[in-house]
């Protein structure tokens, strides 16, 4: 049985930066200012001119958080480069390209507009480690008044006017030179989010016919009945327009979900399988495996095994996938939810670049997506959340015994995962296996035991 314990808890930072309801702690202007000061002080190392890149998605609250962060960084002595609405992977790329000390993205990813978040990237374009985030939190608790920049050492702010074009060119360069998408009709749903300009531009410049959805952000409609978490509109549009492929991004475009020409959804596991096969055939896959999380389907693991590839599993969160990839020299990883990290081209999940790799396979093989993108049959998988109060019941004797019994029933035909949520008082119970009825029974029984332990 896999039992995944949460990383050491921090007060503000979760698995993907700081996130919450806009204008409510921790997503207030005051906390954003404090964060800018603390992170700025931590990353003003050496005697060069220090710089931070700030990007955002299309939420209304971005207009509140962006100037607050800017003021904090300037007060710490850092120059601020404002990139405007751009995908998360674009900010990671620009952080490296501009030799910045830090990158900041203001986004709550796939969440509704009422939420917002802040995530930080180091000079290498990678998300900050848990330890570095803990250092920032500790600084935020201190009196920083005597450590901020002198009047003559304050930073400056400027806008990077060609930020979008730089990212479009970077994404296009992930395809082999000379490969074009002429003749392909693509439906693209940008979730009224950060990629609403750059993703259509990249596909159009590569020669595809692009039918767009979710490209009219108004500050309120990000992820609203659109994007990768609500792919039904994408599926319908693909069928209506007889498109070759549908591409749905989320609000900050770091994840992607696809639809084949029949409108059937293709999740992140299937995308990983396809890219792994293509990269292995081309000799571009580094190492002898790829990285995914504990949530990826056992069907993916078995398919990769047939190719002679291992599936390395990490806790949930694309940052942990990326860390494992770097530690083991692997260049492909991702999550079932659609985060796909191609380390040869990006340091974090990039929905557009992942979609381009799939389109490249369609061009080369000349077969429909329904044939190319369905390389394995997922095993039945069931996930249920159990809310508890008080102490976590995860390690109670009754739950441990019930989990061991469930694992024995799934031996050889499936697997079981129990993990505590890192952000809510929830126990996540996931089982998958060849027998759908058995999977459902195992989850029902375990949830009942957890609920009884919590109530007791």
Curated annotation (Swiss-Prot):
Residues modified as Phosphoserine are 109
Q: What class of enzyme is it?
A: isomerase
Q: Which residues form the active site?
A: 109 (phosphoserine intermediate)
Residue positions annotated to bind Mg(2+) are: 109, 250, 252, 254
Cofactor(s) required, per the database record? Mg(2+)
- Enumerate the SUPFAM superfamilies for this protein: Phosphoglucomutase, C-terminal domain, Phosphoglucomutase, first 3 domains
Extract the PROSITE patterns matched here.
Answer: PGM_PMM
> Which Gene Ontology CC terms are recorded?
cytosol
Q: Name one GO biological process term.
A: carbohydrate metabolic process
Post-translational modification comment from the UniProt entry: Activated by phosphorylation.
What keywords appear on the UniProt entry?
Isomerase, Magnesium, Metal-binding, Phosphoprotein
* Function, as annotated: Catalyzes the conversion of glucosamine-6-phosphate to glucosamine-1-phosphate.
Task: Give the cofactor note.
Answer: Binds 1 Mg(2+) ion per subunit.
Report what the protein is called: Phosphoglucosamine mutase
Any keyword Phosphoprotein? yes
**NCBIfam families reported in the protein's UniProt record:** glmM (TIGR01455), PRK10887.1 (NF008139)
Which pairs of Cys residues are joined through disulfide bonds in the record? none
Species the sequence originates in = Acidiphilium cryptum (strain JF-5)
Which GO MF terms does the UniProt record name?
magnesium ion binding; phosphoglucosamine mutase activity; phosphomannomutase activity
Family, according to the entry, reads as follows:
Belongs to the phosphohexose mutase family.
Catalytic reaction equation(s): alpha-D-glucosamine 1-phosphate = D-glucosamine 6-phosphate
Q: Which InterPro entries match?
A: A-D-PHexomutase_a/b/a-I (IPR005844), A-D-PHexomutase_a/b/a-I/II/III (IPR016055), A-D-PHexomutase_a/b/a-II (IPR005845), A-D-PHexomutase_a/b/a-III (IPR005846), A-D-PHexomutase_C (IPR005843), A-D-PHexomutase_C_sf (IPR036900), A-D-PHexomutase_CS (IPR016066), Alpha-D-phosphohexomutase_SF (IPR005841)
- Enzyme Commission (EC) number: 5.4.2.10
Q: What is the lineage of its organism?
A: Bacteria, Pseudomonadati, Pseudomonadota, Alphaproteobacteria, Acetobacterales
């Amino acid at each position: 049985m896999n039992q995944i314990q949460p990383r050491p808890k921090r007060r503000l930072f979760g698995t993907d930066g700081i996130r919450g309801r806009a204008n409510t702690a921790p997503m207030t202007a005051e906390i954003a200012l404090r964060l800018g000061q603390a992170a700025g002080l931590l990353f003003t190392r050496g005697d060069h001119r220090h710089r931070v890149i700030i990007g955002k998605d299309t939420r209304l609250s971005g207009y509140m958080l962006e100037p607050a962060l800017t003021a904090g960084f300037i007060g710490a002595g850092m120059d601020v480069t404002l990139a405007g609405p751009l995908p998360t992977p674009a900010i990671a790329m620009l952080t490296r390209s501009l030799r910045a000390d830090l990158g900041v993205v203001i986004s709550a990813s796939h969440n509704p507009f009422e939420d917002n978040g802040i995530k930080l990237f180091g000079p290498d374009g990678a998300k900050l480690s848990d330890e570095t985030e803990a250092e920032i939190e500790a600084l935020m608790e201190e009196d920083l008044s005597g450590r901020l920049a002198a009047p003559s050492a304050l930073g400056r702010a400027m806008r990077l006017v060609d930020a979008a074009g730089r990212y479009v060119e970077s994404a296009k360069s992930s395809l082999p030179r000379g490969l074009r998408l002429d003749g392909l009709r693509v439906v693209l749903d940008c979730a009224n989010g950060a990629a609403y300009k750059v993703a259509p531009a990249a596909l159009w410049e590569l020669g595809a016919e692009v039918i767009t959805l979710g490209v009219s952000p108004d500050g309120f409609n990000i992820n609203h009945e659109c994007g990768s978490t609500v792919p039904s509109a994408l599926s319908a549009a693909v069928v209506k327009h007889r498109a070759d492929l549908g591409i749905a991004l989320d609000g900050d475009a770091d994840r992607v979900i696809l639809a084949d020409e029949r409108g059937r959804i293709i999740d992140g596991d299937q995308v990983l399988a396809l890219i792994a096969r293509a990269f292995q055939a081309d000799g571009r896959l580094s190492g002898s495996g790829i990285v995914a999380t504990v949530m990826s389907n056992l069907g993916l693991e078995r398919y990769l095994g047939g190719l002679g590839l291992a599936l390395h599993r990490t806790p949930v969160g694309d940052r942990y996938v990326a860390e494992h990839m770097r530690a083991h020299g692997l260049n492909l990883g991702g999550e079932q939810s659609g985060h796909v990290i191609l380390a040869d081209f990006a340091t974090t999940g990039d929905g557009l670049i992942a979609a381009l790799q799939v389109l490249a396979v369609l061009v080369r093989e000349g077969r429909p997506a329904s044939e190319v993108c369905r390389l394995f049959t997922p095993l039945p998988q069931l996930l249920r959340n159990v809310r508890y109060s008080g102490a976590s019941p995860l390690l109670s004797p009754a739950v441990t015994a019930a989990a061991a019994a469930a694992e024995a029933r799934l031996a050889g035909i499936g697997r079981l995962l129990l993990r505590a949520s890192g952000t809510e008082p929830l126990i996540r119970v996931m089982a998958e296996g060849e027998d759908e009825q058995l999977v459902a029974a195992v989850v029902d029984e375990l949830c009942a035991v957890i609920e009884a332990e919590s109530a007791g």
